[in-house]
């Protein structure tokens, strides 16, 4: 039984962690931190957790959490995880950070896009990017795992087989992605209000979204050369879910059937990545509440381009479910433990 603590437990990703870990047979939650809800029961903050946790949120220092826990999840805004993770690694405690602070092998890229100093370039270079389907073996031996962003998870899983196999021109990739409102977090803001989001869809972060360099870093590693993408996210009036539709030019003619075989081979044995049958395109509601990624693709023979669609739940495979998948790998548990649930549908 592993003792785990969550720093920043009352945001959406923190609450999703509690939901999943409350049914994990090898994890004991020993600390939930929150400044805003200190002294309140977690089930009072999120009544959906009633009957699954009796823990109280506490305003603890990171060291106080580490005194109790063998592994910590950090679910804080970017810029806050560096000192916490640095201290945890000094104490030999495993860390899974759900924010952006450790996702870049070169911390200068982080500083350029997030406009803040990093604080520990050396440790950033040693952190493992926590996408199990790509970095499984490195995650097993990692002490610090950088949980991927939600958009990058969807995009990388969608494009990895094509780039690894050299089937597409890396200079032609377009990623059109759409996310539910929970991706913006729980903090109150005008753009997340019901009357602002409902019956509307809009692009944001055009040509400037901070997930762009994260996507490019991982796709470049897969391709073995520099990859630059055009990435445009959109806000959907749904609670959770991401649908990414990706386009790229083929370097040689290929059929849909040939590329389907490439995907089937690449993801053979993967418990959470599923290539749907021909003609059945991913729906966000099919992965709602699950750690699954649904994929499909088709070749447009008129234009010589391939179209790939990828759907995930932004809070589960795009955040907390993937964090638990990483925990399982780091601790030697079955990778699917506490995660084997289908999407909620309808």
UniProtKB/Swiss-Prot annotation:
It is found in: Cytoplasm. The active site is at 150. SUPFAM superfamilies: Glyceraldehyde-3-phosphate dehydrogenase-like, C-terminal domain, NAD(P)-binding Rossmann-fold domains. Pathway: Amino-acid biosynthesis; L-arginine biosynthesis; N(2)-acetyl-L-ornithine from L-glutamate: step 3/4. Keywords: Amino-acid biosynthesis, Arginine biosynthesis, Cytoplasm, NADP, Oxidoreductase. It catalyses: N-acetyl-L-glutamate 5-semialdehyde + phosphate + NADP(+) = N-acetyl-L-glutamyl 5-phosphate + NADPH + H(+). One of its GO terms (molecular function) is N-acetyl-gamma-glutamyl-phosphate reductase activity. InterPro entries: AGPR_AS, AGPR_type-1, NAD(P)-bd_dom_sf, NAGSA_dehydrogenase, Semialdehyde_DH_NAD-bd. Pfam families: Semialdhyde_dh (PF01118), Semialdhyde_dhC_1 (PF22698). GO terms for biological process: L-arginine biosynthetic process. Its EC number is 1.2.1.38. One of its GO terms (cellular component) is cytoplasm. Catalyzes the NADPH-dependent reduction of N-acetyl-5-glutamyl phosphate to yield N-acetyl-L-glutamate 5-semialdehyde. Belongs to the NAGSA dehydrogenase family. Type 1 subfamily. NCBIfam families: argC. This is N-acetyl-gamma-glutamyl-phosphate reductase. It comes from Moorella thermoacetica (strain ATCC 39073 / JCM 9320).
